[in-house]
From Swiss-Prot:
Species the sequence originates in: Pyrococcus horikoshii (strain ATCC 700860 / DSM 12428 / JCM 9974 / NBRC 100139 / OT-3)
Keywords, ordered alphabetically: Cytoplasm, DNA-binding, DNA-directed RNA polymerase, Nucleotidyltransferase, Transcription, Transferase
Biological processes per GO annotation: DNA-templated transcription
Protein's name in the database: DNA-directed RNA polymerase subunit Rpo1C
Keyword Nucleotidyltransferase in record: yes
GO function terms (MF aspect): DNA binding; DNA-directed RNA polymerase activity
The protein's enzyme class: transferase
């Protein structure tokens, strides 16, 4: 049986070119196997050699057209995706865009996803008790007067707006009529509010037209009484032995501050919010995970390295950029590459106006003019040094 120090020195000696993470993982696995099988020095060396061989086989060849391969590898399975799917992992109450529209949404780096949602995990105190989980959900769920109303009526004779509040919904929300009245009075100075049991009467102080009353009634109905802005309803589900909250709508920055929320595991499907709150590395990981989860949802397998390449290109500059004419492609230095993608004539006119020069260093521009592309063997520039002809000795006179 070899010692752990011998294993470490053998890894350092043989695997000089291996990344540190691979070396560390190899060391941990060898220590474990050594304790179990009592390996000899020759066996350890054989395992290390095999790992190095497999690692070298996994490396991409210099000059490989990785962009083209990634585009094909992601694009081909995407054609098998459904065009519209609106369900989410068993949470039937929450609609979430899946399938091809979601992939397009991610690579376009849309500021606001069509169906934003958060998965909120709870801390040790709240995650095992449903009542405590509901307490946290109430803090998060955005509640408006419209959510609590049983009926709403516009009384055009008395110029009043009457709201019948549902007692059950009111109790569930954790609000009271007094709290609602106080909140509305502080927010709307141009109106008077009166509560009679579960009936709320809104009277504008100064009114000239019926349209003014309608406008005020809409504002009062939509006014947020509690919860986070941008968040609609919440759903509590039991996963394993803990309760998890799913939200319709997203406010990632604020939800992390809510007491009872576990900020280390809570996530959103809004990539830009992740970039703003947690930074660009987290946004890169979110892009990878979102694309992979969307693919898996449809039963499709794509090698993660293709998706990692896309995520790397999108987050290269420290901000999340779309792949398209407003992002990665639109910022290419080559005029011909930009023109080949979209709005050809405009790109060519603008380039001519500015007197731009194309150095023909990329793939697209060389394809356009019929030159060998700088990919694979085309990357190599061969030069040849010809032997100089020996000078004839001057003939003696």
């Amino acid at each position: 049986m070899v010692s752990s120090s011998t294993i470490k020195s053998l890894i350092e000696k043989k695997g000089k070119d291996l990344p540190e993470s691979v070396k560390q993982e190899l060391y941990e696995k060898l220590i474990k196997y050594n304790e179990k099988y009592k390996l000899t020095k020759v066996e350890v060396e054989t395992i290390i050699d095999e790992v190095i061989k497999e690692y070298e086989k996994a490396l991409i060849e210099p000059g490989e057209a990785v962009g083209t391969v990634a585009a094909q590898s992601i694009g081909e399975p995407s054609t098998q995706m459904t065009l519209n799917t609106f369900h989410y992992a068993g949470v039937a109450e929450i609609n979430v865009t899946l399938g091809l529209p979601r992939i397009i949404e991610i690579v376009d780096a849309r500021k606001n996803p069509s169906t934003p949602m958060m998965t909120v995990y709870l801390d040790e105190e709240h995650r095992y008790d449903r009542e405590k989980a509901e307490e946290v959900a109430r803090r998060i769920e955005g509640t408006t007067l419209e959510n609590l109303a049983r009926t709403t009526t516009l009384d055009l004779i008395n110029m009043e707006f009457i709201v019948e509040v549902d007692p059950e919904r009111l109790e569930k929300s954790g609000l009271t009529m007094e709290k609602i009245l106080k909140k509305l009075q502080s927010s709307f100075k141009s109106a008077e509010f009166e509560a009679d049991g579960y009936t709320l009467i809104v009277r504008p102080k100064k009114i000239e037209k019926i349209s003014d009353l309608r406008r005020l009634s809409e504002k009062v109905k939509k006014h947020r009484l509690k919860g986070l802005s941008g968040v609609g309803k919440t759903i509590i589900r039991k996963e394993g032995d803990e309760y998890v909250i799913y939200t319709e709508g997203s406010n990632f920055k604020q939800v992390l501050k809510v007491p009872g929320v576990d900020p280390t595991r809570t996530r959103t499907n809004n990539i830009h919010e992740i970039a703003e709150v947690l930074g660009i590395e987290a946004a890169r990981n979110a892009i990878i995970e979102e694309i992979i989860n969307t693919m898996h949802e449809q039963g499709l397998e794509v090698d993660i390295r293709h998706i990692m390449l896309v995520a790397d290109i999108m987050t290269l500059d420290g901000v999340v950029r779309p792949i398209g004419r407003h992002g990665v492609v639109g910022e290419k230095a080559s005029v011909l590459a930009r023109a080949a993608f979209e709005i050809t004539v405009q790109h060519l006119f603008e380039a001519a106006e500015r007197g731009e020069v194309d150095n023909l260093s990329g793939v697209i521009e060389n394809v356009l003019i019929g030159q060998p592309v700088p990919v694979g063997t085309g990357m190599v520039k061969l030069t040849m040094k010809l032997p100089l002809k020996p000078q004839k000795e001057k003939e003696e006179v």
